[in-house]
Every structure is written in C-alpha cells, then in structure tokens.
Amino acid sequence: MFLGEYQHSLDEKGRITIPAKFREEIGYKFVATKGLDNCIFLYPQDEWQLIEKKLRSLPFTRADVRSFVRFFFSGAAELDLDRQGRSVLPLNLREYAGIDRDVIIIGVGTRVEIWSTEKWTDYNENAQSSYEEIAENLVDLGI
C-alpha cells in the first residue's frame, strides 16, 4: 500500500526519484498516466492490468466512456526505474500536470500521485477546509 507525502525535484533531464518506500511495490516497470485534478497517476503493473480490464468491460457505445478511455490511455506511458530509483516523466504528462521542477509525491493506497508543488498546496488547502464535510458524505458510501 502506498502511503505518505514526499517532496522531490525533477532533474535537468526530467527525471524524478521515486521515494524509496514506494520502489519495491511499484516495481521497476510501471505505468504513468493523466490523473484526475491535473496530477499524474502511477500504477504498478498488476494494478494497471486490473484497471485496464475494468475499462475494457465498459460499453464503448457510450460517449462518456469513449472520452474517458481515450484520455486515460492516450496519456499513458510505461516507465522504468533506473538503479538510483529514477524515471523520466514524459513531457506530455509534465505539461498536463503543470510540473516544471518541484513536485509532491503522495501515496494513495493502490497508486502514487505526482503533483506540482503549487497545485498540491492549493488542492490541499481546499481539501482541508472541507475534510469533515467530505467525511460525513462518505458515510453514505458505507465508509
């Protein structure tokens, strides 16, 4: 399970260092794609295969399904970790997430998210102010 929040910076080659605590679980080959809220999602291969299977089972005759699947898969890239735990983030994903240099890497259970520091700060401030309200709404989902 991926947990925690880490501050990192991209190097001049666009490489990011994956936190040591995440490396074993994410593996040396993993998938990055456009996430929700303008961040980047990273998935271990096994989790990616589960998501891929679920998305393939959706009815492609629905326009919203086609749009989501196109966006999600077209932005995806299979990435590798080098011996130092670094991986090059593709330019299209960096541009999508507004990442120049400084990033926040967070663990979100089954995936890792990479945020520009600025966007994470803004998101986090807004989420903190409504955290209790969100928690109350989750009761409806049985949580």
Swiss-Prot record:
Domain SpoVT-AbrB: from-to ranges: 5-47, 76-119
Molecular function in Gene Ontology: DNA-binding transcription factor activity; transcription cis-regulatory region binding
Pfam families: MraZ (PF02381)
Residues of the signal peptide: none
Keywords: Cytoplasm, DNA-binding, Repeat, Transcription, Transcription regulation
SS bond list: none
UniProt cross-references to InterPro entries, sorted A to Z: MraZ, MraZ_C, MraZ_dom, MraZ_N, MraZ_sf, SpoVT-AbrB_dom, SpoVT-AbrB_sf
GO cellular component, one term: nucleoid
GO terms, biological process: negative regulation of DNA-templated transcription initiation
Domain of life, per lineage: Bacteria
NCBIfam families: division/cell wall cluster transcriptional repressor MraZ
Family recorded in the similarity comment: Belongs to the MraZ family.
Subunit structure: Forms oligomers.
Name of the coding gene: mraZ
Major subcellular site: cytoplasm
Record's subcellular location: Cytoplasm, Nucleoid
UniProt-listed HAMAP family: MraZ (MF_01008)
Name the UniProt record assigns to this protein: Transcriptional regulator MraZ
